[in-house]
From Swiss-Prot:
GO molecular function per UniProt: manganese ion binding
Family: Belongs to the germin family.
Disulfide bonds: 24-39
One GO term of the biological process aspect: auxin-activated signaling pathway
Protein name: Auxin-binding protein ABP19b
Signal sequence range: 1-18
Taxonomic path: Eukaryota, Viridiplantae, Streptophyta, Embryophyta, Tracheophyta
Cupin type-1 domain residues: 53-199
Main localization, broad class: secreted
Organism superkingdom: Eukaryota
Record gene name: ABP19B
Keywords annotated in UniProt: Apoplast, Auxin signaling pathway, Cell wall, Disulfide bond, Glycoprotein, Manganese, Metal-binding, Receptor, Secreted, Signal
Organism field: Prunus persica
Length: 209
């Protein structure tokens, strides 16, 4: 029962782009630009362009964050190109976490379908909003705001995030700071973290300098 309610809610909230065409299926043979993919010629569009089956498979959570995201964005699901919507699957193993991150191009609605997830975001005035979510609960993350998810139980958790863009974008704060070649001294000055801790995080996440 929860899935019909969720998808009806999702479709009502989403905003599609007005167009003289019924759809703009992504043409992966053409370059991807700021406005998205070019449209495939309608004559070669098939029903398979509007169907994606990848979200029924659990993601691999054997990583440092014990988390996996399986996207159904325009890059994977050509039928959502130009429609202002997309979907993904989130798997969190016990102790799993999606660290603070932001989607510059979209708001997000997260539906929990298994387990317990602690989820929240931080507003631009630095006020935190967080809640422990159970099966059937949803939370919205406004566009561009930092947010996170943590498995709040001792069993695997599954959620389906939906987005108000076919290409929501992603920036993870930990990666932005520590998975690059930005000098440790600069990071220490701008974050007040100790240099040894910064070097440790760079080592874990693959950064240098």
């Amino acid at each position: 029962m929860i899935f019909p309610i969720f998808f009806t809610f999702f479709l009502l909230l989403s905003t599609s782009h007005a167009s003289v065409q019924d759809f703009c299926v992504a043409d992966y043979k053409a370059p991807d630009g700021p406005a998205g993919y070019s449209c495939k010629k309608p004559a070669i569009v098939t029903v398979n362009d509007f169907v994606y089956s990848g979200l029924g498979i659990a993601g691999n959570t054997t990583n440092i964050f014990k988390a996996a995201v399986t996207p159904a964005f325009a890059a994977q699901f050509p039928g959502v190109n130009g429609l202002g919507i997309s979907l993904a699957r989130l798997d969190l193993g016990p102790g799993g976490v999606v660290p603070f991150h932001t989607h510059p191009g979209a708001s997000e609605v997260l539906l929990v379908v298994q387990g317990t997830i602690i989820a929240g975001f931080v507003a631009s005035d630095n006020t935190p909003y967080l809640k422990t979510l159970k099966k059937g609960d949803i939370i919205v993350f406004p566009q561009g705001l930092l947010h996170f998810q943590v498995n709040g139980g001792d069993t695997p958790a599954i959620a389906f995030p939906s987005f108000s863009s076919p290409s929501p974008g992603l920036q993870i704060v930990d990666f932005a700071l520590f998975k690059n070649d930005l000098a440790t001294e600069l990071i220490a000055q701008t974050t007040l973290l100790d240099a040894p801790q910064i070097k440790k995080l760079k080592g874990v996440l693959g950064g240098t300098n």
